[in-house]
């Protein structure tokens, strides 16, 4: 039987968080990452949040599912951010923008098994240290396509899929919990249909993904629990495909990505 796809949602809206928990979302992310983010993402359609410690407390006291805090990238501030997040009720921590496996190792030492650890692989420098990263005792990895695009000077976030970088991460971190891209309602997704992304997540052996920022908009006037169930049903169907269907679906996705990028 296929394990469900772990779905994590960014929100500081208590009512939405409670509805998401009832619908079957696995965890809620409060986003503290802000240092240097506006500068590196200027000119790109990317989201920058300004969540606070109070947001963590409000969400953590309103739900029973895990609340996860994305702290800033490793720096002198990291020990204090980790302690504050834990004091506020965080049960998981996400480290973004690591440049080295040593950064990740330091982060893990600071957390000291007190919370789940998710490492974002979103710099070319860390991609080049995967052999060291796989030896560390983190809980999950999420490939951040947007910042990886900026790190590599690429024209599209999808180039890392087309050129095999994403597959290389999955294969190197084989049998660990890894995810990328984003989920939304079945039938949604632009410019690439979500079901195509879901099929690629399945092909690569993904375990988790984040809900897209468009999810809250696309879920309007829909039954959230029914939509989450539809995602999991589509996930199970993706995992039930035979080798020929997997290959055909991959080729269709890559053709669509090439058309979108213009290569």
What are these regions (language model features)?
Residues 36-59, 75-79, 96-115, 125-131, ...:
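Active-site-adjacent beta->alpha loops and helix N-cap segments on the catalytic face
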Residues 1-65, 74-76, 256-263:
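Conserved N-terminal beta1-alpha1 strand-loop-helix module at the mouth
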Residues 58-66, 169-178, 204:
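A structural motif corresponding to the C-terminal end of an alpha-helix
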């Amino acid at each position: 039987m296929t394990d469900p796809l772990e779905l994590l949602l960014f929100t500081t809206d208590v009512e939405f968080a409670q509805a998401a928990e009832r619908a079957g979302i696995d965890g809620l992310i409060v986003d503290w990452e802000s240092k240097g983010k506006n500068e590196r993402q200027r000119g790109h359609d990317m989201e920058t949040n300004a969540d606070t410690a109070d947001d963590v407390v409000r969400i953590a006291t309103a739900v029973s599912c895990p609340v996860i805090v994305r702290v800033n990238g490793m720096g002198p501030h990291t020990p204090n951010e980790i302690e504050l997040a834990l004091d506020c009720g965080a049960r998981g921590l996400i480290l973004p923008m690591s440049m080295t496996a040593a950064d990740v190792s330091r982060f893990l030492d600071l957390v000291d098994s007190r919370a789940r650890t998710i490492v974002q692989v979103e710099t070319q420098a860390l991609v080049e240290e995967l052999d060291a990263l796989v030896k560390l005792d983190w809980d999950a990895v999420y490939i951040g396509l947007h910042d990886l695009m900026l790190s590599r000077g690429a024209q599209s976030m999808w180039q890392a899929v087309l050129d095999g970088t994403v597959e290389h991460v999955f294969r190197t971190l084989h049998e660990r919990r890894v995810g990328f891209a984003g989920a939304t309602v079945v039938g949604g997704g632009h410019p690439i249909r979500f079901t195509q992304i879901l099929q690629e997540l399945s092909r690569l052996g993904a375990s988790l993904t984040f809900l897209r920022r468009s999810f809250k908009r696309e879920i309007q006037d829909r039954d959230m629990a029914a939509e989450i169930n539809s995602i999991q049903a589509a996930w199970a169907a993706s995992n039930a495909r035979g080798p020929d269907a997997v290959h055909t679906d991959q080729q269709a996705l890559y053709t669509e990505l090439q058309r979108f990028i213009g290569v």
